[in-house]
C-alpha cells in the first residue's frame, strides 16, 4: 500500500469514527427534506405573513383612538364674555372667566368685560368643551372628555397596554416553549380578538383601560410566535427572508392602518374594524402545524416525523428516509441533551452560564434601545407640518426601503455587521439634526426619517439575530424576555419626546446617542451567519466563546458559507463514497 493510500485510508477511518459519534442534528435533517422549498414558501405567505396584520392594527390604532383635537371651553349662547381675552391656547382649552365675579361687576357697571378682566379669576370649564372635528369625528378623548385635569387618563390607557405587553412577553414566552408554538398562538389570538373587539363597546374609560391591558398582553407574542415558527421551519437563507418579509409586511400594515384610519374617523368603528375581522384567522387552527424543531427539543419524536414527512413530500423529496434520519438523531442524543429536553426551562436558564448571560444582556440592551427609538421617532413625527394621518402613513412607509437594503447585507456581511450598521446610521441621522440650520424644518424632518430608516431596519435584524442566538429550548422565553424588558423601556419614549418642549432638538439627540451605543455594543456578539441554530443551553453557551482569528466582515461571512460540508459523514451517500474510495486503494 502506497503512502498516499495509507493517508487516504487514515482519513476515511477518521470519517467513519466521526460518523459513529456525530449524529445528524435538526438542521441537517431539515436540509434533507428541504429547508427552503415549496412548503416553506407556501407556509410563510399563506399563514405566517398575514398574522402581522392583527398585531399592527390592534396595537397601533391607539393614536387615532385617543386623538386629542383642539378644544375650547363650551360657552353658552349669549355669554361670550366668559371666554378669556387671550391668545394662549393652553388657557383657552381649559379655562373660562368666573361667571359669579363678572355678574358682581355687571351689577355695578355696564363697562365691557375687557376693562376689568384683569381682576376676574379663571376657573375650569363649567359647561364642557367644544372640539374641533376637522381631524377626528370623535375619539375616546371627545366622548369621555379626557382633557385638562382628566388628560392623565390618556396616558394611563396607553401605559396599560405596555404593562400588559410587559407581562405577556414573559408569560406567553414560557407558554410557547412549554406547551408548543401552535397552541400558544391560538390562545393569544383569541385573547386579542375578544378583548380588542370588546374595547370598542367600552361604556367608560376604566373598562377601556382594562380591555386595553389584555390586548397588550397578547400583542407581542402574536407577532413573535408565527415568526419563531417560520424561523424554525427554514434554513439560513429562509430565516433571512422570513424575518425581513415579516418586518416589511408589518411596516406596510402600519402605513395601511393610517389609510384605514383616514376613512374611519370614529374611534369605536375603527377599534372594531382593527380587531373583529381577524376572527377569520381562527380557521388557521386546522392548518397551522407545530414546529418540528420544538417537537424535537421536547422529545416528541413522532410529531416531528409526521411534520417532516409533510415537508419532504411537498418539497419533492419523498425519497428521503425521514424515519431513519429522525431515529438516528434520537438514538444519538447524549446524556446532557436528554436532560435538557426533559427538564422544564425558564428565564433563569439564560443567565446561569457566562457566555449565554453576556449575549442575553447585550441582545436585551440593543432591543430596549431599538424599541425606545422606534416608538420615540414615531411619536416625534407627529410634530411635522402635516396632519396626523399623513404623519402616520409616512412613519410606516419610510421603513420599507430599509428592508430591501438589509436583505443582501444579511447574506454577505452577516447579522452582526448589518445590525451595527443600521443602528449607527440611525444614530448619525438623529444626531445630525442638531447641526441643521434654523429655518429649514424639512432638514430636521429628513434627519428624523433617516433615523427611522435605520432603526426600522434594525428592528427586523434584531429579531433574526436574537432568534439565532437563543437556543430552541428557551428561544421563545428569551425573545419574550428581551421584548418584555424593551416593552418596559417604551414607557420612556413619550417622556423623551416631551423634552422637546425644553429644547426641540433634544429628543433626537438623546435617541441618536442611544442608537450609537447599541450599534457599538453589537460588535461584542458572535456572528451567526451560516451557523446552525443552537438546540440546547450547552449549544448556546459554547457558541461564540472563542472569537475567530479573522473577523473581517465579508471574509468571515464567506468562510462560514464555505465551511458548510457538502455531504455529512453520516449520510448513506457518503458511506457509498467511502466504499468506492476504499476499493480504489
Swiss-Prot record:
Keywords: Glycoprotein, Ion transport, Membrane, Transmembrane, Transmembrane helix, Transport. One of its GO terms (cellular component) is membrane. SUPFAM superfamilies: MFS general substrate transporter. InterPro entries: MFS_dom, MFS_sugar_transport-like, MFS_trans_sf. Its main location: membrane. Glycans are attached at residues 87, 98, 133. The chain crosses the membrane at residues 41-61, 156-176, 185-205, 213-233, 244-264, 270-290, 361-381, 390-410, 417-437, 447-467, 477-497, 505-525. GO terms for biological process: determination of adult lifespan; monoatomic ion transport; organic cation transport. It comes from the Eukaryota. Residues 575-585 have a biased composition (Basic residues). Residues 1-40, 177-184, 234-243, 291-360, 411-416, 468-476, 526-585 are cytoplasmic. Residues 62-155, 206-212, 265-269, 382-389, 438-446, 498-504 are extracellular. It is a multi-pass membrane protein. One of its GO terms (molecular function) is organic cation transmembrane transporter activity. Belongs to the major facilitator (TC 2.A.1) superfamily. Organic cation transporter (TC 2.A.1.19) family. Transports organic cations such as tetraethylammonium (TEA). Displays a broad substrate specificity. This is Organic cation transporter 1. It comes from Caenorhabditis elegans.
Amino acid at each position: 500500500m502506497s503512502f498516499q493510500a495509507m493517508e487516504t485510508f487514515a482519513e476515511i477511518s477518521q470519517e467513519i469514527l466521526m460518523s459513529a459519534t456525530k449524529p445528524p442534528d435538526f438542521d441537517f435533517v431539515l436540509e434533507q427534506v428541504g429547508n427552503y422549498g415549496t412548503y416553506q414558501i407556501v407556509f410563510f405567505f399563506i399563514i405566517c405573513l398575514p398574522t402581522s396584520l392583527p398585531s399592527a392594527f390592534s396595537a397601533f390604532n391607539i393614536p387615532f383612538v385617543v386623538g386629542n383635537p383642539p378644544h375650547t371651553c363650551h360657552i353658552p349662547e349669549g355669554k361670550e364674555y366668559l371666554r378669556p381675552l387671550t391668545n394662549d391656547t393652553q388657557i383657552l382649552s381649559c379655562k373660562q372667566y368666573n361667571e359669579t365675579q363678572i355678574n358682581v361687576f355687571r351689577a355695578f357697571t355696564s363697562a365691557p368685560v375687557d376693562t376689568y378682566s384683569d381682576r376676574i379669576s379663571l376657573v375650569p370649564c363649567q359647561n364642557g368643551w367644544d372640539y374641533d372635528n376637522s381631524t377626528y369625528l370623535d375619539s375616546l378623548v371627545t366622548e369621555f372628555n379626557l382633557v385638562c385635569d382628566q388628560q392623565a387618563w390618556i396616558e394611563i390607557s396607553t401605559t396599560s397596554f405596555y404593562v400588559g405587553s410587559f407581562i405577556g412577553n414573559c408569560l406567553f414566552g414560557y407558554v410557547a416553549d412549554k406547551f408548543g408554538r401552535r397552541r400558544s398562538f391560538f390562545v393569544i389570538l383569541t385573547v386579542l380578538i375578544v378583548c380588542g373587539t370588546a374595547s370598542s363597546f367600552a361604556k367608560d374609560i376604566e373598562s377601556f383601560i382594562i380591555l386595553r391591558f389584555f390586548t397588550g398582553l397578547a400583542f407581542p407574542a402574536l407577532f413573535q410566535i408565527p415568526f419563531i415558527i417560520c424561523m424554525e421551519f427554514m434554513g439560513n437563507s429562509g430565516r433571512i427572508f422570513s424575518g425581513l418579509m415579516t418586518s416589511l409586511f408589518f411596516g406596510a400594515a402600519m402605513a395601511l392602518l393610517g389609510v384605514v384610519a383616514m376613512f374611519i374617523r370614529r374611534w369605536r368603528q375603527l377599534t372594531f374594524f382593527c380587531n373583529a375581522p381577524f376572527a377569520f384567522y381562527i380557521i388557521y387552527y386546522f392548518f397551522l402545524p407545530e414546529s418540528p424543531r420544538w417537537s424535537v427539543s421536547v422529545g416528541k419524536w413522532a410529531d416531528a416525523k409526521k411534520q417532516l414527512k409533510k415537508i419532504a413530500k411537498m418539497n419533492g423529496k419523498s425519497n428521503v428516509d425521514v424515519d431513519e434520519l429522525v431515529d438516528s438523531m434520537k438514538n444519538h442524543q447524549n446524556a446532557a441533551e436528554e436532560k435538557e429536553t426533559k427538564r422544564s426551562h425558564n428565564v433563569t436558564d439564560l443567565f446561569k452560564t457566562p457566555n449565554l448571560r453576556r449575549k442575553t444582556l447585550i441582545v436585551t440592551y440593543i432591543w430596549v434601545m431599538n424599541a425606545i427609538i422606534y416608538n420615540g421617532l414615531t411619536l416625534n413625527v407627529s410634530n411635522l407640518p402635516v396632519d396626523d394621518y399623513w404623519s402616520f402613513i409616512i412613519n410606516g412607509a419610510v421603513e420599507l426601503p430599509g428592508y430591501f437594503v438589509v436583505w443582501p447585507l444579511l447574506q454577505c456581511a452577516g447579522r452582526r455587521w448589518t445590525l451595527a450598521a443600521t443602528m449607527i446610521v440611525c444614530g448619525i441621522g438623529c444626531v445630525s439634526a442638531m447641526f441643521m440650520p434654523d429655518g429649514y424644518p424639512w432638514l430636521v424632518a429628513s434627519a428624523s426619517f433617516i433615523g427611522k430608516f435605520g432603526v426600522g431596519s434594525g428592528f427586523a435584524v434584531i429579531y433574526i439575530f436574537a432568534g439565532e442566538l437563543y437556543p430552541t429550548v428557551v428561544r421563545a422565553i428569551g425573545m419574550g424576555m428581551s421584548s418584555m424588558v424593551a416593552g418596559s423601556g417604551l414607557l420612556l419614549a413619550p417622556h423623551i419626546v416631551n423634552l422637546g418642549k425644553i429644547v426641540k432638538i433634544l429628543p433626537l439627540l438623546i435617541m441618536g446617542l442611544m442608537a450609537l451605543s447599541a450599534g457599538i455594543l453589537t460588535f461584542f456578539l458572535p456572528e451567526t451567519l451560516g451557523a446552525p441554530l443552537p438546540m440546547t443551553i450547552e449549544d448556546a453557551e459554547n457558541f461564540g466563546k472563542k472569537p475567530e482569528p479573522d473577523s473581517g466582515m465579508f471574509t468571515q461571512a464567506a468562510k462560514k458559507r464555505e465551511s458548510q460540508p457538502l455531504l455529512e459523514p453520516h449520510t448513506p451517500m457518503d458511506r457509498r463514497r467511502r466504499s468506492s474510495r476504499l476499493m480504489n486503494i
